[in-house]
Amino acid sequence: MGKHTKFGSSDDEGETETSVAKRQKDEKKEKKKEKRDRSRSPHKERERSPKRDRHPEKNESRRHDDRDQERRRDYGRNDRRDDRRGDGSWKTDRNDRNDRRNDFQRRDDKNRLSAEEIAAQRKALWGNKKVAGESSSSNTTDTASSSSEPATGGKNEKLWSSAIAATGVDSSKANKFMRLMGVKNAPKPTDDSSRLSDEKNRQDKMLNDLEKQYAIARETTHMGRGTGFGFGH
């Protein structure tokens, strides 16, 4: 072996590279930790480049308002302009908006009719349509004709009166129902026993037919399931 022979030189070099990498990693961690602490500390703020202030007389809130106003676009809609004052600023006062004014409801009621006008219109629509200048003879003939009309009545009026009489409803409810159906001069229900029995039999027959038809339809729907004819799955 020579004079300058060294044993284990490869091991020493390997340990040196490992220690250097570890030291660099630790230094990187320290720098990262220091940077994080500096950003959190209120006393050590990062220096920022100064910005040129074009409007030194405006404060920060005024700049924000101007920036927001530049972003908006007014397309000529009146409902947007109503919320602004003459100088262009938004209405923030309590009484500036239309729906917060004291006379807002009164302005809305301008086109509404008064109670007297509504009563006059109802009277003209539902009241007696006789002419005021008619003679007494014409009045007597009108009353006679009006008294004869309920006795005869139209086809629908007779049908309703017989149906109501067959159900056994009292006269006040029958008159109210006839008025709701649009029959102004409803004829009085007849007390003929034969007509009442015929009407009752007709109603019973109609109810029985409806029950039979419902049973047939239900059975058809139940038995037709799965056939593909629209009765279900």
UniProtKB/Swiss-Prot annotation:
A Pfam family assignment: SMAP
Bias (Basic and acidic residues) ranges: 36-115, 189-206
Top-level taxon of the source organism: Eukaryota
Chain spans, region Disordered: 1-159, 181-206
Biased composition (Low complexity): 135-148
Listed name of the protein: Uncharacterized protein ZC262.2
Organism: Caenorhabditis elegans
